[in-house]
UniProtKB/Swiss-Prot annotation:
Originating species: Ralstonia nicotianae (strain ATCC BAA-1114 / GMI1000)
Any one GO molecular function term: structural constituent of ribosome
Family: Belongs to the universal ribosomal protein uL23 family.
Source superkingdom: Bacteria
Biological role stated in the UniProt entry: One of the early assembly proteins it binds 23S rRNA. One of the proteins that surrounds the polypeptide exit tunnel on the outside of the ribosome. Forms the main docking site for trigger factor binding to the ribosome.
Record's protein name: Large ribosomal subunit protein uL23
NCBIfam families: PRK05738.1-3 (NF004359), PRK05738.2-4 (NF004363)
Length: 104
């Protein structure tokens, strides 16, 4: 595998936001995974290092998917929503990320 960049400034820019949706909540309850929207140029190693740095938890694995933006019509013009890269982060047993507690 490639060497993971340990630049803290870069790791702070990898995670854009947590994904809060019905599917993300179902996955979190069933598989103990957390879903994040990540930078388009991020890789699995950077996502793992960023989650461990920001939330002080141990990560077991990371799965990444690229979601293409949908075609949308704006009046008579066709447009496209932005492409999104998501990361499904599996935490080690006993680990948990509580977003409500982190915000306080």
């Amino acid at each position: 595998m490639t060497q993971v960049a340990k630049n803290d400034h870069r790791l702070m820019q990898v995670l854009l936001s947590p994904v809060v949706s019905e599917k993300a909540t179902l996955v979190a309850d069933k598989n103990e995974q957390v879903v994040f929207e990540v930078a388009r140029d991020a890789n699995k190693g950077e996502v793992k290092a960023a989650v461990e740095l920001l939330f002080k938890v141990e990560v077991e694995s990371v799965q990444i998917l690229n979601q293409k933006g949908k075609q949308k019509r704006f009046g008579r013009f066709m447009g496209r929503r932005d492409h999104v890269k998501k990361a499904y982060v599996s935490l080690k047993p006993g680990q948990e990320i509580n977003f409500e507690a982190e915000a306080k």
